[in-house]
Amino acid sequence: MELIRLTTRLTLFAGFLGLTATLACTLLLVETLFRCQIDRAPFARICFNGVSRCLGFRMSTQGAFSERPVLYVSNHISWSDIPVLGGQVPLRFLSKAEVGRWPVIGWLATQAGTLFIQRGSGKAGQARHEITSTLSSGQSVLVFPEGTTTAGVTVLPFHSRLLHAAADAGVDIQPLSIGYLRNGHPDHLAPFIGEDEFQHHLIRMLRKPAVEVGVIAHPVVTIDNTTDLADVTRDLRQTVHDGLRQIQAGRLSDQASGGPTAVAGPEL
């Protein structure tokens, strides 16, 4: 059964990846020929949702995403956080530079408008400037303030240096919580940690039955240049942590619509 599931999902994933690459090339060609700039956000959101379906995710969401540009902050468990969260609302990501060098995936991430940062390179100031510029242009940006992925059972302390971009751009911050469950417990396959390689992790994910993914969009937090970011950062981390606990306890419901919202992949 695992072999059938893997073969089916891998075929779907590869086929959808090919369609996504074709779409990205088409948009790039149109921009080049007509010397125009196409908003890729709606296309990226469709593609991210497609990836989540191919991975077999069953998603439930709670809360309302901001209708205005905001700086999203979230806990970070896996590379799959990106298609999950990117499928919820149009946004751009801040990602480590290594992702940009991944075959096909890296190129697609670049075409989707991902902002890449060199870890440990002392270029946080440049990243802050790029985030501020993107927010000021009317686009939301998602950052992972933990600075690394975790096993998904807790939330590490948040780094505050990139959160200054929200104050610089005059936008709010909206915390998000994401969690993966399998059989009612934190999933041990979803975390992308240590020296794991993308292709090996992907195969393991595709081989196993569908995983439940919970996302909580918490109320926005307003800051300005007079705000004590150290306190705000601690509060944001606690909010995200409490949300993760709620997801792990299976107490997720869509308060806005009165029921859970599910996006299911193939039942394999």
Please provide the spans of the model-predicted regions.
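A membrane-cytosol interface segment of integral membrane proteins
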Residues: 114-135, 140
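A transmembrane-helix-recognition feature enriched in membrane-embedded lipid enzymes
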Residues: 1-60, 107-111
